[in-house]
Amino acid sequence: MPNPLRKIFRIEVVCVAALIALLIFAGSLFIQRSRSSAEAQTLQERHARLRAAMDRNDQSEAESLLRGMITNDPDAFARNNYDYLLARLLQNRRAGAEAGTFFLRVVNRNSPLAGYALWHLAEIARDRGAYPEEQKLLGKFVSQSGDHLLRDRAIERLADSYFKTGHYHYAIDTLQLLPRSRRVALAKIGEAQLAMRRTEEARRTFEAALANGSLDDASLRACAGLDRIDAATGTVLTEAEALRRASVYQFNRSFTEARRHYLILLNNFPQSRKRAEAMFQIGRGYFLDNDFVEAAKWYDRVHDEYPRTEEGEQGFYYVGHCHQSLGDWMRAIARYEAFLKEYPNSDYFGYAHLNAIDTLRSARRFEDALAWAARAQSNGNNPFTVVNGLFQEAKIRMTQGDYAEALARFTALRSRNLNVRGLTATTNAPEVAFMRAYCLEQLGRFDEAIDEYLALPELREGAAGYYGHRASERLRDLGGDSYAGVLVATRRDAFITQARAARAQGAVEAMKSAANQALRFATGATIRDEMLRILRDAYSRLPGYQLPKISIPEVGRTAPIESAATPPSDDSHQTIAGELLFLGLYDEGAPELLQTPIAKSDYAISLPCARGGCASRTVKFSEPLLRSLPEDYRPELLPLEVAEIFYPFPYRDSLARHAAPRGVDPRFALSIARQETRYNPREKSVSAARGLMQFIASTANQIAAQLGLRDFEQDDLYNPDTAILFGSQYMKNLFAEFGSSQAVAASYNGSEDSVRRWIARAGDNDVDRLVIEIAKRETKDYVFKVINFYNAYQAIYPST
């Protein structure tokens, strides 16, 4: 008799099998429908999604879309050079082998982008240390490149590769392809000749590189080469030659080599008229190398031997700085006191008072510092000294916790002329107004403090712009106080009500004023959006708030090439620019565009350059337009394309790759770069700082060691990606020590030691106490500018 349980089991198995079959069928149907949906998307639609991902720098999404496009339409993928874009994205994430396969496809079909593909294949080979392969690829590029934009760079890179493998004759032949005007190439030819022991040829080549009297990188290489030759041959330098080489080394901060040549002048030419200069520069070199003991010796010597010269006067003064830097407070004070007696009419008279007071403050001798401050205030014949004395006393009182006396001094400063020569080294009107509010806040006089903070409007530039934004930040902080928060909320709500009422009445100026003030407080997103709408409405009705007319034409093609069309095959700059910009590769497309007739139009190239590697051109064009706008025009209300021109965001890939992983906000790094060089990657300053992020040699060498870069050369800093890597690492170090953006900006410009000294002098980590302690005019102005840029970038690009 059959088992009923077995029958039931068979029925269940059949049912389960049927259910599985149904699920498989449904799944296949879903897949087919999904595939059909993807195929139904037009090439134009897929390209639009791809460009949107590229424009927001979502490289992961862009790569995913590109891989889907390979499957959907491989012919269109090649026809539109999407394989080149995919290769670039793969190279960015260090997938060099796979990137190479796609670059090779571009080369093999002789695409207009074949030259760029060869360049990147050579980069991949170089990263692997495969120099023979790199040389083969670059040699092919140079032989086929014609007037390619990368041709000279390829020649330089090929010569460098030959240097690394010891093929100096090939390096010379390669460098000779460059114009004679490229003096760095000339100096490198001399180095290759010297390596081949063609000494006299090398000497003539180095002399030719030095002939125009410049102090630049080419001259530095030439001097180093000549010194190697002279050391081997025992050549004795003339006075003029010793001074020439010393000047080149000193400018480039090669202080050891500079000192050696200054000593030749001092030891061999006792009657030289340049002896005072040589002594002073030796002292300066030691000082900038932080060897303050040796610096003081040389500064004293130049004063002792040449007291009535400019070098003697400055040397006597700078000895005080040496003692101050060594923490030898009493000797520093004695030197400043002696300087005031010996040089009562010196341009440094007021600064000697300032430094004497600062030294006493560092020594925590506050009563003596107050006595010096009073002495400075009594010098009615020198307005700078009087104002400096008042400002110093205010800072001392704050350090002592006596905010009432500090408030009195800041109040006295309000009635003073703060525009006397040199006063930007100490303080300014917005700073004085802000510090009055700060003191009122510390005294618990919140009502008055809030009013004074509100009296400092949010502006874009200068000390006024910086302190307006700092006032808003203090207001938001006060909103969290149990007592002051009630007062803050009352003011905020009043401004919101006023803005709404003014809009209802059509009172445009009142709308603008009230909405601007309301936005300074912490509000919810709904209220903030409402106030911005009111402000936008006010701008539209105020003649002074109309944006300058910026017509941004389309450049490059915008539509993908369909199957029936023939892709472009020529390698003109116009075609290459069009293909690169079509792919969203502004870093290469914008410089190509500058080689076309359209480059004559600042309007046409402003947006591509803002996104690419020529943002310095955009800034040069846009800064006058930005200055034509009212100072209180809020950056976040600019249309995005206009905002990008006023505040470009170039080098997104490098910033995302190097800054963000190190905990550095890319927008802050960008603000530093803007202030340092206006985004010019080839910049070299009078302080011999190189590249986009302006590194001097000593700091660059320290960062290279941290990063484990063994083959680093100073010229590498002219590569924007390398500069951003170094800048990001350096800023990471600074943030780890100092914390605040203001302190990091001050360190970047004025040195870590200076910031440590200013923080110690303030006796407080409060950022507002630090900023008023910044004693260097250039550094304080630098902080204002960087933070103002940072505020604008945060407003325009709320996420990175």
Where are these regions (language model features)?
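Acidic, polar-rich low-complexity tracts and alpha-helical solenoid repeat scaffolds
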Residues: P2-R667, A673-Q675, Y679-V686, M693, ...
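Catalytic and substrate-binding regions of cell-wall glycan-acting enzymes that process beta-1,4-linked
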Residues: E452, L459, S606-C609, R617, ...
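Active-site metal-coordination segments of metallo-dependent hydrolases
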Residues: D571, E644-P650, Q714-I724, K776-E778
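Acidic/histidine metal-binding catalytic segments
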Residues: V664-S671, F738-A745
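Peptidoglycan-targeting cell-wall enzymes and recognition modules
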Residues: T677-A723
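An active-site-proximal "capping" alpha-helix that borders the catalytic cofactor pocket
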Residues: F726-Y730
